[in-house]
From Swiss-Prot:
Alphabetized InterPro entries for the sequence: AAA+_ATPase (IPR003593), Chromosome_initiator_DnaA (IPR001957), Chromosome_initiator_DnaA-like (IPR020591), Chromosome_initiator_DnaA_CS (IPR018312), DnaA_C (IPR013159), DnaA_dom (IPR013317), DnaA_N_dom (IPR024633), DnaA_N_sf (IPR038454)
Pfam families: Bac_DnaA, Bac_DnaA_C, DnaA_N
SUPFAM superfamilies hit by this protein: P-loop containing nucleoside triphosphate hydrolases, TrpR-like
Self-association state and partner proteins as the record states: Oligomerizes as a right-handed, spiral filament on DNA at oriC.
The protein, known as: Chromosomal replication initiator protein DnaA
Subcellular location: Cytoplasm
Region of interest: Domain III, AAA+ region: 129-351
SMART domains: AAA (SM00382), Bac_DnaA_C (SM00760)
Source organism (scientific name): Rhodopseudomonas palustris (strain HaA2)
Annotated region described as Disordered, given as residue ranges: 92-127
Any one Gene Ontology molecular-function term assigned to this protein's record: ATP hydrolysis activity
Gene3D superfamilies: 1.10.1750.10, 1.10.8.60, 3.30.300.180, P-loop containing nucleotide triphosphate hydrolases
Domain-level remarks: Domain I is involved in oligomerization and binding regulators, domain II is flexibile and of varying length in different bacteria, domain III forms the AAA+ region, while domain IV binds dsDNA.
């Protein structure tokens, strides 16, 4: 991808993010790649058929509109499902980074790996494919993921009949920070013997399995099979759609937890932010251990880079990346683990195809499009409510209540104003998060505070202080 194409694609993604909101963008578009731009069409790709179908059904017009703002002559968007594994050395050195599902995968081979079942149990129960490289041994531990790693290890090392310490275990983070790696590691480790049945499913696989069971009138067998699992591992829960499917997931979740079976779940946001999920599901998920995997620190990024180089040497013994180059990459590439792996893949490809050693100059040229500006902190409505409540000495439940006393109304209006100005939530969404209020109530609050801060210096200082606290 040339610099011009990269810049154009970045602008289109920015328009799309502004159009649909941050949460929708993260759920449905974060893994969409630009493949090619033709005179009248644009070729995009996504990793799964489910994503392709959902985007085509619900967002095709928005995607086309965003592209037409950049290239008016574009009249068609071609969306395809890309191969889950792209061989690095089969492409030119400047090819874009792989966007594979599994986080922190080592760049061990330049050919595709066949996915294999963890055990006959996992295979017979129709589990989602597992990558044999995603184990605890290949997971790089750092400050941002220590708790998630420790909790996952404890789950994996448990035995049938042991008391369950935290249930469910809910891991959330942004894209490419290691959630899938940990979940598949739990599955691999748990299925090393025959004592326990550990099943890994993506939310997409769960949906398709349940819908297929309904169509073939085998839903009872589907339910019984799931409820006989010792450890159920569900990935990408944010994609779970449909009231009937969500109800069945809730019943399965309750049945397993009540029976003392372990449930492990991963998603791209905390349970409270999964607005498309039924409140009962969110409540049950929040009742377990909720662990956030924070963005990768520089030391952890360096550790991941080193591990990928070691893995690559297993098949390319002469491949080497000097320490100054690794340190440069760790400082410059800050977004996620996939970009780090993509950088090593590019250096490996360039070095092998051109028979040249890796240098700092080569690295600066090859990864320039992976160096992104630092993203601002993502502020959540729950954070706004918590900090505003603390500032004005009221409770969060007061902000959500119908109370109309002066000591509650003003903080509530300030919180709504901050939610509108510091997040990408729509007015109706903000209203729902403030006790189910109408969007006109939110609009009134926003306009009220906008008018007051220009005249009331005390209120203006309070709002500025709240913004600083939220952005720290």
């Amino acid at each position: 991808m040339s610099n011009m194409e990269h810049d154009r694609w970045s602008r289109v993604k920015g328009r799309l993010r502004s159009s649909v909101g941050e949460d929708v963008y993260s759920s449905w578009f974060a893994r969409m790649d630009l493949e090619a731009v033709q005179p009248e069409s644009v070729h995009l790709s996504v990793p799964t058929r489910f994503l392709k179908s959902w985007i085509q059904t619900h967002y095709s017009d928005k995607v086309l509109t965003c592209w037409q703002a950049e290239l008016p002559e574009v009249c068609r968007i071609d969306l395809t499902v890309r191969s889950p594994m792209r061989a690095a050395v089969a492409k030119e050195a400047a090819a874009p980074v792989e966007h594979r599902r599994a986080e922190h995968r080592p760049a061990t081979e330049t050919r595709s790996h066949a996915t294999v079942p963890a055990s006959s149990n996992h295979d017979a129960l129709g589990g989602s494919p597992l990558d044999p490289r995603l184990t605890f041994a290949s997971f790089v531990v750092g400050r941002s993921n220590t708790l998630a790693h420790a909790a996952a290890k404890q789950v994996a090392e448990g035995r049938r009949g042991d008391p369950v310490m935290f249930n469910p275990l809910y891991i959330h983070s942004g894209v490419g920070l290691g959630k899938t790696h940990l979940l598949q590691a739990v599955t691999w480790a748990g299925n090393t013997g025959i004592e326990r049945k550990v099943l890994y499913l993506t939310a997409e696989k769960f949906m398709y399995g349940f819908v297929a069971a309904l169509k073939t009138q085998t839903s009872l067998a589907f339910k019984e099979a799931l409820r006989g699992i010792d450890v159920l591992v569900i990935d990408d829960l944010q994609f779970l759609q449909g009231k009937t499917t969500q109800a069945e997931f809730c019943h399965t979740l309750n049945a397993l937890i009540d029976a003392g079976r372990q449930v492990v779940v991963a998603a791209d946001r905390p349970p409270s932010d999964l607005e498309s999920l039924d409140e009962r599901v969110r409540s049950r998920l929040a009742g377990g251990l909720v662990v956030e995997m924070a963005p990768l620190g520089e030391d952890l990024r360096l550790g991941i880079l080193k591990s990928r180089v070691v893995a690559a040497r297993a098949h390319h013994a002469s491949f080497d990346v000097p320490a100054p180059v690794l340190e440069y990459l760790a400082r410059a590439i800050t977004h996620n683990g996939r970009d780090l792996e993509g950088a090593i893949n590019r250096l490996l490809a360039h070095s092998k195809l051109n028979a040249q050693p890796v240098t700092l100059e080569m690295a600066e040229h090859e990864v320039r499009d992976l160096i992104r500006p630092q993203e601002p902190k993502r502020i959540k409505i729950e954070d706004i409510q918590r900090i505003v409540a603390r500032q004005y000495n009221v409770s969060r439940s007061d902000l959500l209540s119908s109370r109309r006393t002066a000591n509650v109304v003003r903080p509530r209006q300030v919180a709504m104003y901050l939610a509108k100005t510091l997040t990408l939530r729509s007015l109706p969404e903000i209203g729902r998060r403030f006790g189910g209020r109408d969007h006109t109530t939110v609009l009134h609050a926003v306009r009220k505070i906008e008018g007051l801060v220009s005249k009331d210096t005390t209120l203006s200082d309070e709002v500025d202080s709240l913004k600083r606290q939220l952005q720290e």
